[in-house]
Amino acid sequence: MAWMTRRTLKTAAIAGLAIAASGGAAVTTAGLMWPNTISPDLAPVHEMRADQALLAQYPQTIKADRESQAALAQAPAAANAWLRRAYVRQLGTRTLDAQALDYIDKSYRAAPLGPDVTRWRLRFIFEHWSEMTPALRTRAVDEMRNFARYHSGGPDLVRAIHNPAGRWAAALVERSGHNEALRDHGMLAKAAE
């Protein structure tokens, strides 16, 4: 090893790390592109499989729940997986029982203000507004107000809600958040003139 200089060793180490990183990236990418063929035990792969199971003509709720559990084993703070478990539970029981409400609460603990899960979670909660606990309603109101302040999709989200009570509540909160955004930018007084 006397013939290897310090610079040669550094170059060899960097090349080795680059090869290992590209191999890991290839396995991960292949697993995400073909989740049924190559199956690394990664949370995003399990989440893709769970989504595919629910998108089937006849939703495969047991498979979706099993894949969501596997995703949570890899990434316990995956708000989408917690919310999907609540959705699957609701499909099975036709109501939001205590377990489903607990899953929704866990999705809020994982990601209180989204952002990736916000639209789906808000629509799901406002569709089942009468079944929500006061604590979950408060969290949904805070999330909707925040969403309306910083995003332009609030009215579209409200229109997508079919439950009349939930749509009414969402519309009030969305308007409140929108007005707060206008007030923050000094535009509310101008709009009233």
Identify the role of each PLM range:
Residues 2-74, 141-193:
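N-terminal alpha-helical interaction modules that lie
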Residues 92, 117-134, 156-167:
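TPR/TPR-like alpha-solenoid helical repeat scaffolds
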